[in-house]
């Protein structure tokens, strides 16, 4: 079982609309503004918004992360609170990203009941 950790990587402690930057910067141990700027640059390169899944998916791929879709078992997908497929991962749930590491998920709100559509792990 994973435990919720109330954590906000946003340097101004703002809430909302930046889960992509928060999850990625926390997972990569990069500062929020660096990740935000790099996503914006890639968004401009791809002519798309930086928080679009195609943009952040490409960003993670270029940074050495691998996408793993979560297949439903018996019609159900794993929940954030019981995700156990990787020790450290960025999880994609409905309209949201969250970082999980060592049985803790880091976010500004408890998204533990959300179903996991897929996740990224760092290629070693």
Predicted regions and their residues:
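Active-site nucleophile-adjacent alpha helix/oxyanion-hole segment immediately C-terminal to the catalytic cysteine
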Residues: 1-48, 53-64
